[in-house]
Amino acid sequence: MLEHFCECYSNLSGLILCPVLGSITPLFIPNSRIRPIRLIGLCASLITFLYSPVPRIQFDSSTAKSQFVESLRWLPYENINFYLGIDGISLFFVILTTFLIPICISVGWSGMRSYGKEYITAFLIREFLMIAVFRMLDLLLFYVFPESVPIPMFIIIGVWGSRQRKIKAAYQFFLYTLLGSLFMLLAILLILFQTGTTDLQISLTTEFSERRQIFLWIASFASFAVKVPMVPVHIWLPEAHVEAPTAGSVILAGIPLKFGTHGFLRFSIPMFPEATLCSTPFIYTLSAIAIIYTSLTTSRQIDLKKIIAYSSVAHMNLVTIGMFSPNIQGIGGSILPMLSHGLVPSALFLCVGVLYDRHKTRLVRYYGGLVSTMPNLSTIFFSFTLANMSSPGTSSFIGEFPILVGAFQRNSLVATLAALGMILGAAYSLWLYNRVVSGNLKPDFLHKFSDSNGREVSIFIPFLVGLVRMGVHPKVFPDCMHTSVSNLVQHGKFH
């Protein structure tokens, strides 16, 4: 039995089992004992995070094949298995997921008095589902896990949201993702009928006719575009962010927005290369419009959370430009901004959460002069503002610069529009910081509150370390990803 246990952990089953066990245990504890419930949730998430870098130590970056593969029969049908693995692309997204969950639990530490164990259970189940999303190698799981993630998020927004419109935002978020996923289910069924299996590796080697490729690509695009999100199916994101609690916004910005781009990388691009090349002008046009539109829309917002939400849409559409530049620079460069995007908007939402806890408003017009009353938070806010505007030395710059290089090789006009979007991003980021931090304090609206406390600063430090680490010495990421990205480009005959 001990050998089986060790084998399970060597195959990364622990990354899935730990949050599952952590989510079940609090259900047997009375709601009145909130402290042990908090500690169980935090310990389960921390153990998962501390274990998540282990695959990086054992990972063989010289091969593009999936590693730490696990297969288990879970349905009474042949060729449909619980099939999980990990490669150079998904490795760091698993680590990012396990990094954010302990922070989300810590952020909700003081607000966990009502429905405490439900709060812990929702976040840990969400962690299990998100880890599984990045490890799945089965097409049916490719549908089941991403479409299960919105369920705990629906509960998080609907129960712990901050305003009366939270129910509407929760339903809007859930319905958008549900309707988009139906097209993905149709595509998976058609692939199953042709290949006779849901094994992703086998499906990737299957030759589809050009007409079938185009149809399947459109079906998958309809699902992934909602998750990115791309214009015009982005409306759900600002509403969900505004109504979600701080921890909900952190995890929503950090992980689920990557499901769409991860789906393009894992499914649409390698499986339908001809359709991908045919659709590249469409994706370029749609992404460029989204970048300019959302950047201009951001400058007109009055809610701090909506500003960050629209900024996220612009950054993620820049990622899609790189992803559909059929070269190593574009595809490889698009992965780093996805990781960076898991840190920067999440940290900015934390900053807004600190302000909201003290002043009970997120409207920009009520803020100003915070540098005199909250110098620590102002400095932290400035650091993440620099990252949001892709300043050199930050993680955002390291990823977005290769995207522009790859896009220029494909379409100089689209690359120019993307660069213009980055300039607009710098403009609204500095405008926001200036409005909130500089100027005179408005005593009629804001009272003098204490600066960030030790718990809040300790939550920000890992984000700062991650941003600087990725920005100054990002070599570890391309080393692990290069073989997987090269294989993807060669498999699609993009070179």
From Swiss-Prot:
Example GO BP = electron transport coupled proton transport
What the entry lists under InterPro entries is as follows:
NADH_Q_OxRdtase_chainM/4 (IPR010227), NADH_UbQ_OxRdtase (IPR003918), ND/Mrp_TM (IPR001750)
A single GO cellular-component term on record:
plastid
EC number, UniProt record: 7.1.1.2
**Is Metal-binding a UniProt keyword of this protein?**
no
Keywords noted in UniProt: Electron transport, Membrane, Mitochondrion, NAD, Respiratory chain, Translocase, Transmembrane, Transmembrane helix, Transport, Ubiquinone
Question: Does the keyword Electron transport belong to this entry?
Answer: yes
Q: How does it sit in the membrane?
A: Multi-pass membrane protein
Q: Which reaction does it catalyse?
A: a ubiquinone + NADH + 5 H(+)(in) = a ubiquinol + NAD(+) + 4 H(+)(out)
Which molecular-function annotation in GO is an example for this chain?
ubiquinone binding
Q: Which residues cross the membrane?
A: 9-29, 39-59, 89-109, 139-159, 173-193, 214-234, 272-292, 313-333, 335-355, 367-387, 413-433
Q: Name one Pfam family in it.
A: Proton_antipo_M
What does the UniProt function comment say about this protein? Core subunit of the mitochondrial membrane respiratory chain NADH dehydrogenase (Complex I) that is believed to belong to the minimal assembly required for catalysis. Complex I functions in the transfer of electrons from NADH to the respiratory chain. The immediate electron acceptor for the enzyme is believed to be ubiquinone.
Similarity remark: Belongs to the complex I subunit 4 family.
Name of this protein: NADH-ubiquinone oxidoreductase chain 4
What organism does this protein naturally occur in? Brassica campestris
The gene is ND4
